[in-house]
Amino acid sequence: MQALMEMQIGASEVVQVLDTGCAVLPPESPLPMPEQSLRKGRLHVPRQRTAPLGIGLRRFYLIGGTMSMSLIATWVMLAVMWPGGINVLEGCLLVLFMFLFAWVTMSFASALAGFFCMVFGGGRKLGIDPQMPLPDLHTYTALLVPTYQEDPCRLLAGLQAIYESLSETGQLEHFEFFVLSDSRREEFGLAEEREYAALCERLGAHGRIFYRRRADNTGRKAGNIADWVRRFGGAYQQMLILDADSVMTGDTVVRLVAAMESNPDVGLIQSLPVVVGGRTLFARMQQFGACVYGPIIAYGVAWWHGAESNYWGHNAVIRTKAFADHAGLPALPGRKPFGGHVLSHDFVEAALIRRGGWATHMVPYLQGSYEEGPPTLTDLLIRDRRWCQGNLQHAKIVTAAGLHWISRMHMLIGIGHYFTAPMWGLLMLVGIAIPLVGDGIDLTAGMHFSPAHYWHGRTDGDVLWIFTFTMFVLLAPKLLAYFALLFKPYERRACGGALRVLLSILLESILAALMAPIVMYLQSRGVFEVLAGKDSGWDAQQRDDGKLSWSVLLRSYGGLSVLGVLIGALAYTVSPPLAMWMSPVVLGMAFSVPVVALTSHRLVGAVLRRWGIFLIPEETAPSKVLIRVAELRRARQP
């Protein structure tokens, strides 16, 4: 603290501003950031200069293909159910099937486009070519690191690695760094100030790295960024937003900023962060999935998003004036959870920037962007509860005046993601109910494994066709991702080779299937809690590998295990074939406690890593910046 107060900084360059605690900040350069209206507004520049050729055809393929495949599958399902008429429950089943099949089909269509982009080299845009020499910069960019009660040692280790990497590019003079704290607890504030002072001493970065802690953290992260824009944004043409666990190479940062400089009508460029640093089985499984499946998904959505891409809230560069002019978020009318400050602000900010006439792009092929994932399923679900509320809150924003229809689609997809969970649950419950009210169903029948057993006069062939096609659509993105990896020798070897990658995909699919019912149940509960008016609150995120005690596991998942046993028993009583078809869901629920315990264990993750399972290139051949982050964190550990 004393070192911070005694920093010798030229008064013409830096002044100390009291927010709370001790702040070290540059002279203020205010930039107006008016609050935007959701009732008034119009779409500026309906078609962007940087939009890909044929973007309309790409979107027609996605929507038309989704609708066509969904209608065909629904028609076949209707034909299966039609003989003898359809009762109310069967009608509900058909409607649920139609919507859920359309949901997975859209993901398949997008992944298929991503596969061809990856294999045949499409999708590069904005003049960003990682193989070309590093361009020279001519503007100033602020790297913003918002933090809320995070471990400052971990946080500033990442910041130091980015700083050093940018210094190696020879263009550090174009960047300044801001640690923007919203921490409320005094012990976190004091630790942040102490670590910040030590960082500046180590790097000799006085006058280039700044720190402040807000006295009033209104608006959470969005309010934190908005406060910086209004006070300091006028001095910087771009800002690069980082999360507390974000790391980026200097090369990647420079290329993103250069793309912004050379495309004056672009307001936002989102990179694809690679998930790294996982040690538990769950974290390593998640980062493997993000490594193998993530690119094909990202290439696909970038292909049809065009100049209307989304924003994930971090690891993205934003034109400061575009953000200030158009992304001032209003408070939503009404009480929480639907009213108040916008929680999932990133989607809305991207939509408003696009409404203001600026293009928003994603560049999934640019490597060197990293983040960390939650260590356990429990930590993911805690975070997911907040995302659930934020996405459902978009129901008040999706009809805002002047938004591009793709921006509205982003919000509807986010809302739909959470409503699919209770829809899957309803599909399961309706499946149990149909044999109960069916005419002539023999509940004592033997183990006849065909679902056609539930309806008289239905053929096994039609039902098998529906089942096979549904499973193909569900699993095809993973298969396409595997085939795409086979075309990339370096990545294939870095992931352990073709055989180990295939084994990893199989194990990941099994674990994901076991955890899917847990996620379905808790996401459904989250939806109902939001609809009932329960707010998610704002807690610090768990980033280190936290151990879960058996008492916590039983308290969190014991009820779900009992529910799974009861549903399985009921399904078997109704019809043994039904119980057999429902067994993946029932087993996942019934064994939720041991599944979460197993996947939360670091030892299991370490063993699988030694066996070459769930390997990613960032483990077998980490970049220099990741090696540096690990060194700095080890050095700062007590």
From Swiss-Prot:
It is an enzyme of class 2 (transferase). SUPFAM superfamilies: Nucleotide-diphospho-sugar transferases. Pathway: Glycan metabolism; osmoregulated periplasmic glucan (OPG) biosynthesis. Its EC number is 2.4.1.-. The chain crosses the membrane at residues 57-79, 94-116, 415-437, 464-486, 499-521, 578-600. The keyword Isomerase does not apply. It is a multi-pass membrane protein. One of its GO terms (biological process) is glucan biosynthetic process. The keyword Glycosyltransferase applies. Disulfide bonds: none annotated. One of its GO terms (cellular component) is plasma membrane. NCBIfam families: PRK05454.1-4 (NF003957), PRK05454.2-1 (NF003958), PRK05454.2-5 (NF003962). Involved in the biosynthesis of osmoregulated periplasmic glucans (OPGs). Belongs to the glycosyltransferase 2 family. OpgH subfamily. HAMAP family: MdoH_OpgH (MF_01072). This is Glucans biosynthesis glucosyltransferase H. It comes from Xylella fastidiosa (strain Temecula1 / ATCC 700964). The lineage of its organism: Bacteria, Pseudomonadati, Pseudomonadota, Gammaproteobacteria, Lysobacterales.
